[in-house]
Amino acid sequence: MITERQRQILNLIVSLYAKDHTPIGSKSLLDSIQASSATIRNDMKALERLGLIQKEHTSSGRIPSVSGYKYFVENVIQLEEFSQNDLFKVMKAFDGDFYRLSDLFKTAAKSLSELTGLTSFVLNAPQRDQQLVSFEMVMLDNHSVLSVITLGTGEVRTNQFILPKSMTEADLAVFSNLVKERLVGKKVIDIHYTLRTEIPQIVQRYFKVTSEVLQLFESIFDDLFKEHLTVAGHKNIFDYATDNLAELYKLFSDDERMLHEIREITNNDEMRAVKFDNDEKFMKNLTIISQKFVIPYRGFGTLTVVGPVEMDYQRTLSVLDLVAKVLTMKLSDYYRYLDGNHYEISK
């Protein structure tokens, strides 16, 4: 346990070091701490013994340690009001109407990346507990078909595809009835199971060429089973990482691995999570920060940034909080739009 003055000193060292990455000496703290230079030096020695700050080899000053950053984020930091400049930039980015959920997430990821200078990720809420409430298929012409899936949240998914050569319009009607009888009313997680157990056997009874029918099932429903990760700021790693660039770039391009990292640190009820001690050797000097945001009627999505341990946590957390609030506001508008019997067209 550290004293209140030591807490103030740690706060100042972290904040000052984030600005110019210069080791901090006791004289730099005199104007902000009501104590003598000797008292401040003693408190700095106490913080050093606790492993919260450390000596920089080329200077007599001190810099925050990984443990110091962790303590700062968990016990010291207090979120300040976001700056008017940041608020203007985020509101401008989200200005206008959004008709696709993916566009909202892309805007959020880009805003996070540009304002923090870090690599950012946006994760949608899991869809496994959503219910399929209706399914329709519409012939657009002799060859093109539009499938329309409606979920319990009011969200509508559409998928345009070319009718397989082996299928007639009569076959399409049978297909549609199968979906309505076997899948409508079920949760997404149960649909996933049914498609892999019951449906292949049923398809054999109704269709001569089963492979194309099963592929059609997969084409229409596969997107429901995926967690979608939106990424921005890949190139920012060149600004904050000097080692293992290839490994980092590979990680940030691998949705499954990043999903694992994000899920690992957000697997609790906390709205915000910070991971300092990463098992991956090439990420030992990096920090992962995730913050949940509300998705109306669906639960929580996650905003994540990855950056250097010595990042400006005060600003980064403030920007995360700002983007989360604006994104939730725009998501509310988006779902009101869907409630007006509109739906987005999937590419």
Curated annotation (Swiss-Prot):
Disulfide bonds: none annotated. Keywords: Repressor, Stress response, Transcription, Transcription regulation. InterPro entries: GAF-like_dom_sf, HrcA, HrcA_C, WH-like_DNA-bd_sf, WH_DNA-bd_sf, WHTH_HrcA_DNA-bd, WHTH_transcript_rep_HrcA_IDD. GO terms for molecular function: DNA binding. It holds the Pfam family HrcA. The keyword Lyase does not apply. GO terms for biological process: negative regulation of DNA-templated transcription. Belongs to the HrcA family. Negative regulator of class I heat shock genes (grpE-dnaK-dnaJ and groELS operons). Prevents heat-shock induction of these operons. This is Heat-inducible transcription repressor HrcA. It comes from Lactococcus lactis subsp. cremoris (strain MG1363). The gene is hrcA.
